[in-house]
């Protein structure tokens, strides 16, 4: 039943008093004298133009998907009697009554929830909001719903009159309602097309399908199943096709909207990689794009800096002269190669290169000098195990050690000379003894 909520204590004529300062009238002329004498609300200034901007009614609502309202016309319909007599059963509702209740609920809710008042009341028609062009769409929708309900109620009253063919008339009325519902369902957009993801509620029953809407639901289900099973397999966008041809221009426009919605949803699912592959199907295999970035190689000069906190090195062989020559040759060769590979530069760039080369050579010279000090330190017995010996100490200890070594050398040379003389004497004595024995 429609939910009609009316407030009897509210006077809708007072609505004009709140907006009266916004309407400008000439003081010499009284345009609303006749209306005030008849105690009617004066019309709004936009009364002559609101018909030009009358809005069209809203699109048809989607059919209900409840299981109690989804019985087809093939099921035997028992007539309903509001008096509760024996032939109607009193407590059972026929398909026509259920569909009428749904229609009344949908229409009544749309009007009564928008305006909390009775649509049959005169104050509802006289309200200034209805006469305004911005609110004309609601009045047009209410008028359309009321006319449709009135025609259905008149048909039901004719069918409810006592006659021998009462069951047949109720069945025909129910088939009329079912045809109207199927037409509305065919005009509506299937929610599964707009929202193609499966619902979690698997226990909810499916909506009733009429012969006209069964083809649409079958085609949409097959389209969705093919899209969900292989969303990336088809490179071309899928388009929604209906088996039933469109009857009006509004149907064709809604079909175009359905097609656009479906194309957008399918194209969003395709990754950019698949689109590129679909754009060029002749390219075979996983061929990489011809992308060869320019890599500029920079020469790396190995710089060795001594770590004083590191443990003592056990390496004793330091061919300093050869290493200096080889490193200097290698660095100069790398610098010359870099100059050959690069393009001719300006004078500033050449100066920077010279400065960089000088810094590299100077750093290499210092490293070699440091290595020489380390080698000298390792040769001194007193500083052999001292990793943190300064250079001055190394030089002093090295000088002392060299002098001591030279003194030892002179001593050993003198001893050698004495031993050689002793040998000569012994040889001469042995020769004399041999001659005496002979």
Swiss-Prot record:
Biological source species: Callithrix jacchus (White-tufted-ear marmoset)
Keywords, sorted A to Z: Acetylation, Activator, Chromosome, Cytoplasm, DNA-binding, Glycoprotein, Isopeptide bond, Nucleus, Phosphoprotein, Proto-oncogene, Transcription, Transcription regulation, Ubl conjugation
Function: Transcription factor that binds DNA in a non-specific manner, yet also specifically recognizes the core sequence 5'-CAC[GA]TG-3'. Activates the transcription of growth-related genes. Binds to the VEGFA promoter, promoting VEGFA production and subsequent sprouting angiogenesis. Regulator of somatic reprogramming, controls self-renewal of embryonic stem cells. Functions with TAF6L to activate target gene expression through RNA polymerase II pause release.
Free-text description of this protein's post-translational modifications in UniProt: Phosphorylated by PRKDC. Phosphorylation at Ser-328 by PIM2 leads to the stabilization of MYC. Phosphorylation at Ser-62 by CDK2 prevents Ras-induced senescence. Phosphorylated at Ser-62 by DYRK2; this primes the protein for subsequent phosphorylation by GSK3B at Thr-58. Phosphorylation at Thr-58 and Ser-62 by GSK3 is required for ubiquitination and degradation by the proteasome. Dephosphorylation at multiple sites by the PNUTS-PP1 complex promotes MYC stability by preventing ubiquitination by the SCF(FBXW7) complex.
Motif (UBR5-degron) on chain: 354-363
Positions of region (Leucine-zipper): 412-433
GO molecular function: DNA binding; DNA-binding transcription factor activity, RNA polymerase II-specific; E-box binding; protein dimerization activity; protein-containing complex binding
UniProt superkingdom: Eukaryota
Biased composition (Acidic residues): 251-262
Domain text: The 9aaTAD motif is a transactivation domain present in a large number of yeast and animal transcription factors.
Protein name in the entry: Myc proto-oncogene protein
InterPro entries: bHLH_dom, HLH_DNA-bd_sf, Myc-LZ, Myc_transcription_factors, Tscrpt_reg_Myc, Tscrpt_reg_Myc_N
Region annotated Disordered, chain positions: 201-294, 335-357
Transmembrane keyword on record: no
9aaTAD, short sequence motif: residues: 100-108
GO biological process, one term: rRNA metabolic process
Amino acid composition bias (Low complexity), ranges on this chain: 210-237, 278-287
Pfam families documented for this protein: HLH, Myc-LZ, Myc_N
Entry annotated with the keyword Transcription regulation: yes
Cross-link (Glycyl lysine isopeptide (Lys-Gly) (interchain with G-Cter in SUMO2)): 52, 143, 148, 297
